[in-house]
């Protein structure tokens, strides 16, 4: 579809959406349908520490901040295939990194700023490779840490292991993508940061990097937008995101600015769309309790039940 036609879809009538959207340029679905990233949390109980966590995140006086937008602001990802050369990477945190090799090269996009994330999806194997503090280094690649994920699996990283994110979670599954907004539905939670995290993690997170302040949320904490939030004044495209925030919510995945949520680099994002998302107040979110949904400690799979009420359809 021509970019102008896609923009017309976002600006006007949104097309019906399938239950999942493959990574653009691949046939790879991002995790199975019973993965926690894709859990509908709209009916889950409110977490008993919801108000405390929101207080530490300054929710009362803060609005959401889209950490992406035009012209090239956000997190890159690259699609590769079996023809791309694989390399070994020298890791700072090798004991908590997957050894690889990685399809990383001088052609790989690296996120700007201090985190320098590099995300690569192998379209032939549906494998996600992620690096933190990635540096090509003249053909002697280095990174702070690295993680490899089978996009067809619910397996989590070993407990206590970091990833390219402080929470030990994958980054790509939590990024807002333009193709999803244009299709009319987002079927997963979105990655969010906060300045203050407690030095602990809860499912599905696997790693902590916080403080001893128990008022702060742990890595893996999940927040959903209240069902009563009025989206009538927002554009059709912004309402797609609002619906996802009500249904799938936000997962605390890293330390950073309060209520910053991430998306991919895409030249089709517009300032008007991003500015609308900045009007969503953080006080309209609630932390949810996912403990009743977990199938097993080392799995990202969820199972509906009395303690995990999931809407049908």
Located regions from the model:
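Secretory targeting and sorting signals
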Residues: 1-20
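Short, surface-exposed polybasic-aromatic patches that bind anionic ligands, especially phosphate groups
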Residues: 21-313
């Amino acid at each position: 579809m021509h970019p102008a036609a896609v923009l017309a879809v976002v600006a006007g009538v949104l097309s019906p959406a399938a239950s999942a959207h493959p990574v653009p340029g691949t046939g790879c679905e991002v995790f199975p349908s019973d993965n926690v990233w894709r859990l509908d949390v709209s009916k889950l109980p409110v977490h008993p520490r919801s108000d405390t966590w929101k207080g530490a995140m300054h929710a009362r006086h803060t609005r959401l901040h889209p950490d992406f937008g035009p012209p090239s602001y956000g997190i890159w990802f690259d699609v590769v295939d079996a023809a791309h050369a694989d390399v070994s990477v020298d890791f700072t945190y090798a004991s908590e990194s997957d050894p690889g090799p990685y399809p990383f090269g001088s052609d790989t996009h690296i996120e700007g700023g201090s985190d320098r994330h590099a995300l690569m999806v192998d379209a032939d194997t549906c494998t996600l490779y992620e690096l933190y503090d990635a540096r090509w280094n003249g053909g002697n690649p280095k990174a702070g840490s690295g993680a490899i994920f089978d996009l067809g699996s619910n397996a989590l990283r070993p407990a206590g292991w970091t990833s390219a994110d402080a929470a030990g979670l994958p980054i790509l599954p939590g990024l807002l993508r333009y193709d999803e907004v244009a299709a009319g539905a987002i079927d997963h939670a979105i990655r969010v940061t906060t300045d203050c995290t407690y030095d602990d993690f809860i499912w599905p997170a696997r790693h902590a990097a916080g403080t001893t302040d128990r008022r702060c949320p742990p890595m893996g904490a999940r927040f959903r937008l209240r069902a009563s939030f009025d989206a009538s004044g927002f554009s059709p495209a912004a309402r797609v995101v609002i619906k996802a925030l009500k249904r799938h919510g936000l997962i605390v995945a890293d330390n950073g600015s309060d209520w910053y949520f991430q998306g991919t680099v895409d030249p089709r994002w517009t300032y008007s769309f991003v500015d609308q998302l900045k009007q969503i107040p953080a006080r309209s979110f609630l932390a949810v309790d996912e403990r009743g949904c977990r199938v097993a400690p080392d799995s990202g799979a969820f199972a509906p039940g009395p303690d995990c009420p999931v809407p049908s359809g």
